[in-house]
């Protein structure tokens, strides 16, 4: 499959939770058979997709845990009080907030407008670059 089909799969049926993926419908995808080289259409189910991405989901959880372990006590207190905010396209992966929250015991939320908020925040930082430099 190509990148566009992979993105469609992620949006429509991918889940960070194998257990909850069982509740999601399957979908038909089209691509090229790697053995024959011919076009092929197959049905894939959400559980298989969830199993296929589990290593990536676990890597995200490990990275979050390592970051939390290295965080100052003051920031850790803020994280406990206010939670973790997910941004970017990956934040839209079904059940990701719940999976991360279960693993970290910290509330997890999806940012408002997760696809654009990083770019918007970067733009705001660039507008205030002198203030940012003084904070160092």
Regions found by a protein language model. Give the residues of each.
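Phosphate-binding glycine-rich/basic clefts of nucleotide- and phosphate-handling proteins
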Residues: 1-54
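Charged, alpha-helix-enriched surfaces in structured cytosolic catalytic cores
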Residues: 1-4, 8, 44, 48, ...
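Glycine-rich phosphate-binding loops at beta-strand->alpha-helix junctions
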Residues: 14, 76-100
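PAZ/PAZ-like end-binding module
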Residues: 35-40, 44-45, 64, 104, ...
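Phosphate/ATP-binding catalytic cores across multiple sugar-kinase/actin-like superfamilies
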Residues: 52-79, 125-128
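Residue-level signature of catalytic and energy-coupling elements of molecular machines
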Residues: 64, 86, 122
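Conserved phosphate-binding/catalytic loops in two-lobed NTP-binding clefts
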Residues: 98-124, 132-136
